Amino acid sequence: MRAGQPKITGAKITGAIIAGGQSSRMQAGGVSGDKFLQPLGSAPVIAHVIARLQPQVDTLFINSKGDLSRFAAFGLPAVKDIAMNHGGPLVGLLTCLAHASPCRLLLTSAADTPFLPCDLASNLIRKQAETGARIILACSNERVHPIVGLWHTDLVPDLEKWLQYAEKASIFWFAKHIGFEVVNIPLAHAPRLAESYDPFFNINLPDDLLKAREINEALQA
């Protein structure tokens, strides 16, 4: 497990790891427990996410709607979802934005993406400075990753309203409603891997976990 690069200077950033989802596809495949707590090399999946994000931000916390005691070993604040009639990842995003609101910018990631770029924050901040957009999302292999993004924390009222009235309660559709820019991140390489891999590769299925272990072993070589 390798740490990220030093955080970019000139902007205060709060980071949030959103540990949502039910891990249902993983459990249906015979793997019990939370997908982000599965072992990946010498540490759980989420520990790799922490190691890559923490050096890029000023403060970092974990968000979840479940039992927060699961995260006690990681030494980070854990914030439970705001109680709302709606559910899903947008509530997690709202919780993170509200918790980070003393800071101007929030960097988010899922808890099951262990190979995040070590220069993710600097690339997203650069795009935000160039465009002035309130939402910057990561993109790789022609696919936008709505959970991985840089958000202006003044979006809280917009998101609260969206959750009240919107029919499409997804992060992507909220971002599309507000307007967003993307940063295209190239596929990554490891010397012992025959093929490149997506730095936003996420773990949903048992086969994904096996692939993640293969990538991790190659990165540690």
Swiss-Prot record:
It holds the Pfam family NTP_transf_3. GO terms for cellular component: cytoplasm. Signal peptide: none annotated. Mg(2+) binds at D112. InterPro entries: MobA-like_NTP_Trfase, Molybde_CF_guanTrfase, Nucleotide-diphossugar_trans. Gene3D superfamilies: Spore Coat Polysaccharide Biosynthesis Protein SpsA, Chain A. The keyword Transferase applies. The N-terminal domain determines nucleotide recognition and specific binding, while the C-terminal domain determines the specific binding to the target protein. This is Molybdenum cofactor guanylyltransferase.
